């Protein structure tokens, strides 16, 4: 299977070569990689330009000025990379972050899963970060069964079936739900992990509750489901005020949704606590 790898990059001079070198050393080499330099003001562009001179499977696309925003912007940058190729030439589409170091057998293992199960729509390993002791530990932001945003891969047929990625906050959860909606399996390889050099969304921790409200809106939750989801998060984080911040953010949203009514219905059903109980009967 042939892989297309898109790497959005914004001011990644400290990590970009570590990422690219780890891909250049993959045991599975049937891939092309496009680095999309999203208006970097550091040495990212120069570093990648020098790298691609010696690595013909890699190419660079430069964009002009950028604004840094979680979620929506990275998807828009990703699509700039897709425009550079004909997807007819590829079987698997990947969106990788520029601050990831991949083990040499990463793509080989991903390819094996796709080949063995035609209904597998998304595959990844796990994401590890370095703790204060210098140890590499699991980045415990989500379930180990979730294909994380920094290391997304999609079977092309699945990518088309779910109409691609949505350029909104929460895109990296929406894609999983839409893959499930289209009857594709989601696989994570538990003994295959990558090194994440910079913890996810580290710049946005202070805005977590506000972003959660925006996310609930983006996935089409109605008011009762948003309240239940906000309450669960608030209880988990032991923060009474978080509930009100999240709901205020949810109620303030008014932009058009990027989901169809059919997709919204599926997601609401998926997240409905009562429906989950009924499904277990």
Residue ranges and their predicted role:
Residues 89-101:
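Short beta-strand-to-loop acidic/aromatic patch adjacent to the donor-nucleotide binding site
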